Amino acid sequence: MSHPISVTILTKNSQKHLPACLEALQRFPEVIVLDNGSTDDTMAIATRFPNTRIVEHSFIGFGPLKNLAAQHATHPWILSIDSDEVLSRELADEILQLALSNPQQVYRFLRHNFYGKRHIKACGWDNDWVLRLYHKGTTRFADLPVHEYIQTKGLHVQNLQGTLRHFSFDSIAQLLDKLNQYTTLFAKENRFRKSSSPAKSCLKWAFSLFRNYVLQRGFLYGYEGLAIAFSNANGTFYKYMKLHEENQRLDISLIITTYNWKEALATVLKSAFRQSELPREIIVADDGSREDTRDVIEALAKESPVPVRHCWHPDTGFRLAEIRNKAIAMAGGEYMVMVDGDMVLHPDFLKSHRRMARKDQFIQGKRVLLSSETSQSLMNGQIDKITPFTAGIKNRFNAISSGTLSGLFSARKKDIKAVRGCNMAFWRADVVKVNGFNEDFVGWGREDSEFVIRLLNQGIARRNLKFGGVAYHLYHPENTRNGLNANDAILEKAIEEKSTFCPNGINRHLAANQH
């Protein structure tokens, strides 16, 4: 061995196979055992081997834990082994004789998987090549909670001849324990990244069972093959059902901006109270309204099924960007849905936003334009419900709310055309990443577009929500456009510089809220 190798092992209650695992590694100069909460004899077993060094850490996901173990290693070449795996003598000899002169090289070898003492060559357990030997200065494990892997982009992968024995499971009880753990991790990892449904879960279960038991020859291995095939299929079913369940839960803060139009705000707030899926809170972002607006908010808050918070600052001119930042900074939700105080919400408004939410995306919604007469009737309580056929609607297609149509026609866009903050949704973490709205904007216009430019440049995709997120825009005369030329200049600068961050943004409000 021209270069010493550090072996890393994750353990938790690993006493059964750990002695054989460590026995096969005695010729390696260092073995890092990273334990995350063993309550059996795992630690005592590890201390019996002079080349082992024990590190303890709570569970943070398999990928992050393996990278942490590598950080504790003395040597740059890392051999990552699981505590239920045993190197064959031939594989150990082969690894110890490698020159390891090229850090761009990574090595993999064949793993034989056992159920009890039986070598299983079916159900996807055969032809199992695992990549485990790498230079930690060149690559690392992907930071995934489950199904972690060594990143190999730009690296050369070399196969070794020796084999690794993997004592996967000894009983059906172990299969079920692992199934529950891994399906939960999968669901949390893919929450709002992948879609799922009960129908999809059932179809995937049926195909997985057929593939494992028939196509991958599980039927040749007796009850063990049947148990493994059903375990794999059930794992597929439950990971997608758990994902479906996770995707139903979104912690939404609804932010409503307002300025001195208490009648419209009252109508919007009442529509928020009637949502089929309620937010965790409603925050009124008030750009300096008079005291009568505060009175309306406080009175309606007593009727609200969720907390209503009033975020206000003095009226020193049109400072929409700043009051939005202040409201987002005080929000407790993970997901922000933002509307103007003249946008009356369809009962499924938040539900359709939740259905369309995806990590690394923001949502641009539309608005249904109402006539002056219809707007007044709605505020006076003369109209109880608006449909696409209600009189006084100027763009009726925008009034259609359908989960099926929304999923089919809500497309990604890469531009800032028709960006409107009056109906928009985004992850709070993404807002922080670009430092929120740019408070250099004073006066009406362009603060939404400049915010979106930075999101797009950060790799946050835009998705236009169609046939969902329906909101009815109450008619009013257009705002004055004083200051638009200066705001246009700020927007053009952000476009030219491909801006991803604004200095004058939300960070100071976040810091203030921490005190």
Language model: regions and residue ranges:
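Catalytic-site signature of metal-activated, phosphate-bearing donor transferases
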Residues: P4, G63-A70, S88-E246, A321, ...
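Cell-envelope/extracellular polymer assembly enzymes that use nucleotide-activated donors
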Residues: P4-S6, L250-S253, E281, E450
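Short, well-formed alpha-helical segments that are part of the catalytic scaffolds
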Residues: I9-R27, W261-R274
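Acidic helix N-cap motif at the loop->helix transition within catalytic regions
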Residues: H17-P19, D40-R48, E90-L91, A266, ...
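A conserved acidic beta->alpha catalytic loop
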Residues: A24, D35-I45, D82, S271, ...
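Conserved donor nucleotide-binding strand/loop of the catalytic core
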Residues: M43-H72, R294-E322, K326, M330
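Acidic metal-phosphate-binding loop of nucleotide-sugar-dependent transferases
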Residues: W77, D84-L87, M343-V344
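Short aromatic/hydrophobic "clamp" motif used to bind/position activated sugar donors
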Residues: I78, M336
